[in-house]
C-alpha cells in the first residue's frame, strides 16, 4: 500500500518539527512527573490523577506518532512550488478583493495541516482555496462559501 504524501511548505514542516519536540519534552517532563507523583499516592485503581496523566500521556504520544508519520511522508514545497507568480498554487501569497465586504484580504494557500486563520493561512481544500487554485491575477470569481452563500472576489496579486 502506497504511503500518503503530505505536501508542506518549509515553514509548515519546521513548525511540525518544533511541535513534536515540545510534545516530547512535555511527555518526558511534566506528564512523567505527574504519573510518578500519582503512583506514589498508592492504589492506582481509584486514582483520578493517575488516570488523567495516563490519558494525557496517550494523547500526546498519539500526536507525536501522527506528526512523525506526516514528517516521514512529507514533500516540501519550496517557494510556492514554483517561481511563476502568474498562477495561484500551494504556498503562494494571494491578495484578493472581496466585493461583498468591499475590502482587500491577503493570505497564503497552505495544506490542511498548516491552515491557521489567525496567521492568514487558508487550506487549499477550503472552498476559497479550491476556487483559487490555478487562477490568474485579475480573474473575478464567484465562490460558494462553506455556509452556502456566494461571494465575488478578484485576484489582485500573487506572490
Curated annotation (Swiss-Prot):
One annotated GO biological process: regulation of DNA-templated transcription elongation
UniProt superkingdom: Bacteria
Molecular function (Gene Ontology), one example: RNA polymerase binding
Residue stretches in coiled coil: 2-41
PROSITE patterns: GREAB_2
Gene3D superfamilies, sorted: Transcription elongation factor, GreA/GreB, C-terminal domain, Transcription elongation factor, GreA/GreB, N-terminal domain
UniProt keyword terms in alphabetical order: Coiled coil, DNA-binding, Transcription, Transcription regulation
InterPro entries membership: GreA/GreB_C_sf, TF_GreA/GreB_CS, Tscrpt_elong_fac_GreA, Tscrpt_elong_fac_GreA/B, Tscrpt_elong_fac_GreA/B_C, Tscrpt_elong_fac_GreA/B_fam, Tscrpt_elong_fac_GreA/B_N, Tscrpt_elong_fac_GreA/B_N_sf
Membership in a protein family: Belongs to the GreA/GreB family.
Function: Necessary for efficient RNA polymerase transcription elongation past template-encoded arresting sites. The arresting sites in DNA have the property of trapping a certain fraction of elongating RNA polymerases that pass through, resulting in locked ternary complexes. Cleavage of the nascent transcript by cleavage factors such as GreA or GreB allows the resumption of elongation from the new 3'terminus. GreA releases sequences of 2 to 3 nucleotides.
Protein name per the record: Transcription elongation factor GreA
Record lineage: Bacteria, Thermotogati, Thermotogota, Thermotogae, Petrotogales
Amino acid at each position: 500500500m502506497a504511503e500518503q504524501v503530505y505536501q508542506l511548505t518549509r515553514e509548515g514542516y519546521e513548525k511540525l518539527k518544533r511541535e513534536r519536540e515540545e510534545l516530547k519534552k512535555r511527555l518526558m517532563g511534566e506528564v512523567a512527573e505527574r504519573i510518578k507523583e500519582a503512583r506514589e499516592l498508592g492504589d492506582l485503581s481509584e486514582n483520578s490523577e493517575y488516570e488523567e496523566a495516563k490519558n494525557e500521556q496517550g494523547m500526546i504520544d498519539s500526536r507525536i506518532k501522527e506528526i512523525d508519520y506526516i514528517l516521514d511522508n512529507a514533500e516540501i514545497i519550496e517557494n510556492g512550488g514554483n517561481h511563476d507568480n502568474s498562477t495561484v498554487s500551494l504556498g503562494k501569497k494571494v491578495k484578493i478583493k472581496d466585493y461583498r465586504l468591499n475590502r482587500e484580504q491577503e493570505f497564503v494557500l497552505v495544506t490542511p495541516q498548516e491552515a491557521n486563520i489567525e496567521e492568514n493561512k487558508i487550506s487549499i481544500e477550503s472552498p476559497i482555496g479550491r476556487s483559487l487554485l490555478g487562477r490568474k491575477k485579475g480573474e473575478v470569481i464567484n465562490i460558494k462559501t462553506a455556509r452556502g452563500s456566494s461571494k465575488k472576489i478578484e485576484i489582485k496579486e500573487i506572490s
